[in-house]
């Protein structure tokens, strides 16, 4: 009986230590992304910190994902370098992080084409009321040009990605 109690105390002590270490890691900001990388062809979003991968997510994109966004309504997800410049906790898509599209290059291209470049490109969750779809949302590209993850994933991403974080969107 004494051996059993000693073993239980050791296990409980280890669990408490691991729990405290996890809380310390979050409290000190060890898990803050300093860059986001979107690879459209791979349909992948990666959160990076000091060149190390923090998290990777499978994503859905605009319904016409090949090539860079050229105009409003083209169903394309932009390509280029941007920043996360805001968030919307009252989003129609659970929660969203705003991407600074269009940049100067995008505006110039749209002006040359005589079109609006579009706006409101976000990383977001599922349309409100459809969170139950979860990971099945990646079976096809369904957004208007945004980058979509599950509700649980955007809830995980948002606190790890401060405003001002650079995001690179590659083909």
Predicted regions and their residues:
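Intrinsically disordered, low-complexity
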Residues: 25-57, 61-67, 72, 171
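N-terminal post-signal-peptidase region of extra-cytosolic proteins
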Residues: 28-34, 61-86, 105-109, 151-152
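Exported/periplasmic cell-wall-interacting domains
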Residues: 31, 86-171
């Amino acid at each position: 009986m004494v051996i059993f109690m000693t073993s239980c105390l050791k296990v409980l002590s280890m669990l408490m230590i691991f729990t405290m270490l996890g809380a310390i890691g979050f409290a000190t900001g060890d898990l803050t992304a300093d860059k986001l990388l979107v690879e459209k062809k791979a349909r992948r979003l990666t959160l990076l910190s000091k060149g190390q991968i923090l998290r990777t997510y499978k994503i859905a994109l605009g319904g016409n994902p090949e090539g860079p966004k050229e105009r409003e309504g083209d169903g394309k997800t932009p390509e280029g370098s941007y920043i996360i410049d805001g968030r919307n906790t009252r989003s129609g898509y659970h929660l969203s992080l705003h991407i600074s599209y269009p940049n100067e290059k995008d505006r110039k291209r749209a002006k040359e084409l005589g079109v609006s470049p579009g706006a409101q490109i976000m990383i977001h969750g599922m349309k409100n009321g459809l969170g139950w779809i979860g990971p099945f949302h990646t079976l096809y590209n369904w957004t208007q040009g945004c980058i979509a993850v599950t509700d649980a994933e955007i809830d995980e991403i948002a606190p790890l990605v401060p405003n001002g974080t650079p995001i690179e969107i590659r083909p």
